[in-house]
Amino acid sequence: MGIWNYQLLNVFAESPLGGNPLCVVEQAEGLSDAQMQALALQFNLSETVFLLSSEQANAHMRIFTPGAEMAFAGHPSIGSAAAVSRLQGDLQRLTLACRAGLVPLDQQDGIWYFSPPKAAEITPVSVPAAEMAAALGLQEEDLAAAPVWVNTGSDQVLVALKSTDALQRAWLDAAKLACWPRSSVGRRTVFLFVPDEAEITARYFFERPNGGTGEDPATGSACANLGAWLQHFRPADSDRQWKVWQGAQAGRPSCLYLQVAPQGQIRVGGKVVFFASGSFTL
């Protein structure tokens, strides 16, 4: 039997009980893949990170949802950076490794920023837009553009909407999921946003492993994909910064700081609140 320590953090949090909760297991050597997956289900957060030693980076992240391992995810990267900094001597700049590649991070004015691990890929979605709108409880007229796949480390469907009213009405209907495309890791998700606002409002829905759908309060990888969407479809909006608000309807108000540069660089940032720590024995 062994003892492992963990930290509970709220990522993209502007208040102590806001943001997206994250569990970071420190020095996770000795845990099997099956144990990591079972522990992610035990903690039952949107993601749980297991930190391992790395020769290429300050630490290697294994990122698990309750149902699957992820190649990359944004709020685990931000939260892990804060946790690793705390463990390794208050670092202001570090690199984390994950299955998708290396993720550089730095802290500025209390905000941790990451750059996504790969160049953006944008491809069409094969499902008709009207069918996808119906699965969201919307009309095709509510869409501001055709849904697309965007991948800067985690492939997701992005759907731009015309109004905040449509955004507030939207919900991924579990009864209509059969039409929804799956990502490279078999997940059904969607990131909805209204692109015309000075401060972007967004929502992220996902299929739960055991049925039904849920809403994520803050999704850093999707925010990075949003940056790629803006670069591709709104090049005039390059070299800008946005606050992206997410999570209000989920009861966890969250703020993501998005920076988009005309030469292609994307940075996503957020504040991290340390909430609790503990240990478990296996």
Predicted segment positions?
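N-terminal, positively charged, Ser/Thr/Ala/Gly-biased leader segments
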Residues: M1-G18, L138
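Short conserved micro-motifs on helix faces and helix-strand junctions that flank
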Residues: P16, L41, A71-F72, V150, ...
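Short beta-strand-to-turn element immediately C-terminal to the catalytic PLP-Schiff-base lysine
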Residues: V24-Q27, L51-L52, L158-K162, F193-P195, ...
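Anion-binding (especially nucleotide phosphate/pyrophosphate-binding) glycine-rich loop
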Residues: Q35-M70, V194-T201
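A common structural junction motif
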Residues: F43-E47, A175-R187
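Acidic, low-complexity central loop/insert segments
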Residues: N58, F64-P181, E197, Q231-L282
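Short glycine/threonine-rich catalytic loop with a Thr-x-Gly-x-Asp
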Residues: M70-G74, G212-L226
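Catalytic strand-loop segment that frames the active site of acyl-thioester-processing enzymes
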Residues: G186, A198-N210
